């Protein structure tokens, strides 16, 4: 189940498919995202999505938190010619894979391949990352 103040029913099927644990979902603007990115990652710039896994000390705790930049999601959706909800779904999949332990910076393409499989399964448009894979 997704824990969020925003209505995001369209993401529930993705969250349920990827696991039984709850996930906190937060929507922010570009300025807020830049502040979070600076505080958490020492990067003084905005970004589209961040994920923060929680230590699995207690099974009742959520898997972690996903923070999505709505400003960049709207821009990217317009640029790539798909809906805002589709872009949010693409970002959510990417972040969920990070929460599940995938890391595209250190693996041999496993995360990208899993992301591609999920995008196809949920009949979403290809993300920019998947488009660059060929």
UniProtKB/Swiss-Prot annotation:
Compartments, as annotated in UniProt: Cytoplasm
GO process terms (BP): rRNA processing
Main location: cytoplasm
Alphabetic keyword roster: Cytoplasm, Endonuclease, Hydrolase, Metal-binding, Nuclease, Ribosome biogenesis, rRNA processing, Zinc
E.C. number: 3.1.-.-
Positions annotated to bind Zn(2+): 94, 98, 104
Superkingdom per UniProt: Bacteria
Pfam family, one: YbeY
GO molecular function: metalloendopeptidase activity; RNA endonuclease activity; zinc ion binding
Keyword Coiled coil part of the UniProt annotation: no
A cellular-component GO term for this protein: cytoplasm
Free-text remark on how the cofactor is bound: Binds 1 zinc ion.
Cofactor(s) annotated in UniProt: Zn(2+)
Described purpose of this protein according to its UniProt entry: Single strand-specific metallo-endoribonuclease involved in late-stage 70S ribosome quality control and in maturation of the 3' terminus of the 16S rRNA.
Similarity field: Belongs to the endoribonuclease YbeY family.
HAMAP family: Endoribonucl_YbeY
Protein name as it appears in the record: Endoribonuclease YbeY
Organism: Campylobacter jejuni subsp. jejuni serotype O:23/36 (strain 81-176)
GN (gene name): ybeY
């Amino acid at each position: 189940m997704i824990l969020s103040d925003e209505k995001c029913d369209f993401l529930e099927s993705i969250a349920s498919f990827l696991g039984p644990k709850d996930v906190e979902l937060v929507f922010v603007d570009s300025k807020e995202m830049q502040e979070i990115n600076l505080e958490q990652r020492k990067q003084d710039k905005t970004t589209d999505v961040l994920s923060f896994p929680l230590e699995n000390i207690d099974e009742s705790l959520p898997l972690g938190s996903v923070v999505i930049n709505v400003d960049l999601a709207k821009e990217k959706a317009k640029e790539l010619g798909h809906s805002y909800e589709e872009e949010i779904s693409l970002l959510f999949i990417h972040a969920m894979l990070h929460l599940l332990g995938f890391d595209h910076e250190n693996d041999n393409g496993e995360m990208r391949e899993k992301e591609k499989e999920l995008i196809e399964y949920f009949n979403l448009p290809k993300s920019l990352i998947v488009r660059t894979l060929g």
